[in-house]
Amino acid sequence: ARKQINKLLYAKLGTNDVRKKWWNPQDENNEKNGYQQEKFKFKDYAKWTGDYIFMRIEEMFLTAAEASCRLNDDKGARLMLNSLMQERDEDYTCKKTGTALGKLTSDETGSLLEEIIIQRRIELWGEFGRIYDIRRLKQGFRRTADMGWPSSALIASTDTEDPESYAWV
């Protein structure tokens, strides 16, 4: 089965966000709480020819936004984030401030840093090792079937909520 975005993350996309086309909510193969991805397609299935993404300018914008935010330059961080997002959703405007993050990736604080991380998750979905961001941010995570995770990916026997645990790396 192809990878699917969970509905909770998909719901964070604005109504006019062009990235919504990266997933198909109508696909007959969707899991209960996930949507099939349309972001990556093979040019030639027989030869496995396709896109190999190493870094995009969008990642640079998001990295600069995060760095500015961590340096308490909320204005600069919002400028970088809003510049990128105007290419994705012309209705998007971020006015958030602060660097608070929840203990778990699903714990929302409403901070600017959290918004940058959410947009990073969406923008780089399927391209970059999300697990490295989770480790770097010192957050734990929780996977549930309600979030769209198949039973094989739930990691039920591992304490993923402890950000210091190396059992899930």
Each predicted region: which residue ranges?
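Acidic/polar-rich alpha-helix caps and helix-coil junctions
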Residues: 12-169
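His/Glu-based metal-binding/catalytic segments typifying zinc-dependent metallopeptidases
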Residues: 1-8
